[in-house]
Design a protein with these regions (language model features):
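Bacterial Sec-dependent N-terminal signal peptides
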Residues: 2-5, 9-41, 278, 521-540
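Short amphipathic alpha-helices and their capping/turn segments at secondary-structure boundaries
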Residues: 30-38, 177-194, 249-254
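Catalytic nucleophile-elbow at a beta strand-turn-alpha helix junction centered on a G-D-S/GDSL motif
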Residues: 40-56
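Conserved SGNH/GDSL esterase-like catalytic core that processes O-acyl groups on lipids
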Residues: 58-243, 268, 273, 387-388, ...
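Histidine-centered active-site loop/cap adjacent to the catalytic His
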Residues: 67, 71, 481-538
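Surface-exposed intrinsically disordered loops and tails
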Residues: 95-107, 120, 132, 151-177, ...
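A structural motif corresponding to the C-terminal end of an alpha-helix
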Residues: 191, 244-261, 435-455
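Acidic, Ser/Thr/Gly/Pro-rich low-complexity segments that form flexible
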Residues: 270-451, 455-488, 502
Length: 540
């Protein structure tokens, strides 16, 4: 199931270079001006997209290419002041990740790299040295906090170590919070901002989407405005979002600062949701050397056909389809929006096994296991979005049953459904879209009321799906790294959610265009082409 890529050796030196831009343009400050803006104290509000998070983590060299840091360098030409970012000097191996008291913090792995020897993205091998306990307790101009939702920026204790141990704080803010009870906004306002960028809001819907809809849409809950009832993967209630967003912006402009607010991207257009096809099951993918193609497909269809026949008796036969050796066949997935037919399947399967009509003898426990899996199973359609994380599931074996013939029979995505959390179905997509539209309406209304500039990242990244041409003539795309073919155009990092250095430069360039137009400024743009793309290594 792995793709094979060809790489060109002479490019390796360029590819393996550090994350600093390799070309510096000479800029004559006399030809540029700040217009109606004052960049003497620029602060950046946001989440991981603001922090410079990429390749699945926040690491030292990656942070240097955060879009706020890129902007700050351009602002210096027109009177911009110092710009500080949370220190990552203790990330001595430049691999990111996170420790707590010297032990790995679950879910905080090292950065992803493309291993050229295996043609696959892998976590970089290396020792994690970044520790939550190294607390700077200082406000920084880049106030992007990976994982933060809108309401988190106003929450006291979001940087408290005791709250972190209770699962109620953020390790990145714990490292910088000036006190246990401070808020992100309280700390950033001590820097007396004169200009800001505010790109917060994506996580208010993204966490739900990247979990395959495992959370709740709080807009559908009776107590949807009660934050104590929220789970990490929930969609934020529109009322909560509005109150938090207005509070953030009101705080930022309270001292006279001007700025740019950015809309929430349609997360379903990013590579995390568009890379894995719904129909990757082909003859080439499942027939091994030496196997007979007809025999393989015949055996698979014997099993699928039996389940289809059972579901037909229950009026749901269209949930499944037989595999065609000449076509790209869809994945078998779980869909929790379907009626659960587990009880009925349990009864019918037991009858088939007892009568000897099932291919192998199964115990009652094994029958229950299969009935549970197929109770809400169906074949995927083109409308389903397979998560990037589903790649590792396809064709994978289930936990051993102790019965070799059963283990060989059930393969994830082929003859046993991939779990619902690896799929964003149509119902879940509609919830994501509704929330995104509502959030962006709020963002634009607040910007209009306060006279702020708007960088429409939703529109920009949606257009990038088909390719966007910029001043250097290059076309940049919102797709996943596919090899040398899109090495110089891909904007997303290997996690499929966050941008790579080139992508963040692309964002910075768009924000500069917005600033120049709205605030009648003339600030030099940046050239994304001189920033690195995916991180490739010969071996890991």
């Amino acid at each position: 199931m792995k793709r094979k890529y060809l790489y060109i050796a002479p490019l390796l030196a360029f590819i393996a270079a550090g994350c600093e831009p390799s070309i510096k343009d000479e800029i004559n400050s006399g030809t540029y001006y700040a217009g109606e803006a004052d960049f003497s104290s620029y602060v950046a509000i946001g989440n991981s997209l603001t922090a410079g998070y990429m390749d699945g983590t926040l690491y030292r060299s990656g942070q240097q290419n955060s879009f706020p840091n890129i902007l700050a360098q351009q602002f210096k030409v027109v009177g911009g002041g110092p710009f500080t970012q949370p220190p990552l000097d203790d990330d001595t191996n430049d691999v990111g990740g996170m420790l707590i008291n010297g032990n790995p913090l679950p879910g905080f792995d090292t950065k992803l790299v493309m291993n050229m020897s295996t043609s696959s993205p892998e976590n970089k091998k290396g020792t994690v040295t970044l520790d939550v306990n190294k607390r700077a307790q200082k406000a920084y101009h880049n106030a992007g906090v990976p994982g933060a939702k809108t309401f988190h920026l106003l929450a006291p204790g979001y940087g408290s170590m005791s709250n972190l141990l209770a699962g109620k704080a953020n390790p990145y803010f714990v490292r910088t919070a000036t006190s246990d009870e401070t808020t992100v906004m309280a700390d950033v306002m001590t820097l007396k901002p004169t200009f800001f960028t505010n790109w917060i809001g994506a996580n208010d819907v993204l966490a739900y989407a990247t979990s395959g809809g495992e959370g709740l849409d709080q807009n559908e809950q009776a107590n949807g405005t009660d934050l104590t009832q929220y789970g990490g993967n929930d969609i934020t209630h529109v009322g909560v979002f509005k109150m938090a967003y207005e509070g953030i912006v009101n705080t930022l402009v309270s001292g006279g600062a001007k700025g740019v607010v950015a809309t929430v991207p349609d997360v379903t257009t990013i590579p995390f949701f568009t890379t894995v096809p719904y129909n990757p099951i082909t003859s080439a993918a499942i027939v091994q050397p030496g196997q007979n193609e007809d025999a393989v497909f015949g055996q698979l269809n014997l099993l699928i056909g039996m389940f289809k026949e059972v579901l037909t008796q229950l009026g749901q036969g269209d949930r499944l389809q037989l595999l065609d050796k000449t076509k790209a066949n869809p994945l078998l997935i779980q869909d929790k929006t379907l009626d659960n037919l587990e009880p009925q399947l349990n009864v019918i399967l037991k009858m088939l096994v007892d009568s000897g009509k099932f291919p192998i003898k199964l115990s009652d426990q094994e029958i229950a296991f299969i009935a549970k899996g197929f109770g809400q199973a169906r074949h995927a359609t083109a409308k389903d979005l397979m998560l990037l994380t589903s790649r590792a599931q396809i064709g994978g074996a289930l936990p051993s049953t102790g019965k070799p013939e059963m283990d060989a029979m059930l393969k994830k995505g082929i003859t046993y459904p991939i779990d619902d959390k690896f799929v964003l179905n149509v119902v879940e997509q509609e919830k994501v879209q509704a929330a995104t539209n509502a959030f962006n309406s709020i963002i634009k209304n607040v910007a209009n009321e306060k006279g702020l500039a708007v960088a429409d990242m939703n529109d920009l990244l949606r257009k990038a799906v088909s390719g966007l041409r910029v001043e250097d003539g290059q076309i940049y795309t919102a797709d996943y790294f596919k090899g040398m073919g899109n090495l110089n155009t891909v904007m997303f990092s290997l996690d499929g959610v966050h941008l790579n250095p080139r992508g963040y430069a692309f964002i910075a360039a768009e924000i500069l265009r917005v600033i120049n137009k709205h605030y009648k400024a003339n600030i030099p743009l940046v050239n994304p082409a001189v920033y690195p793309g995916p991180t490739l290594v010969l071996q890991n």
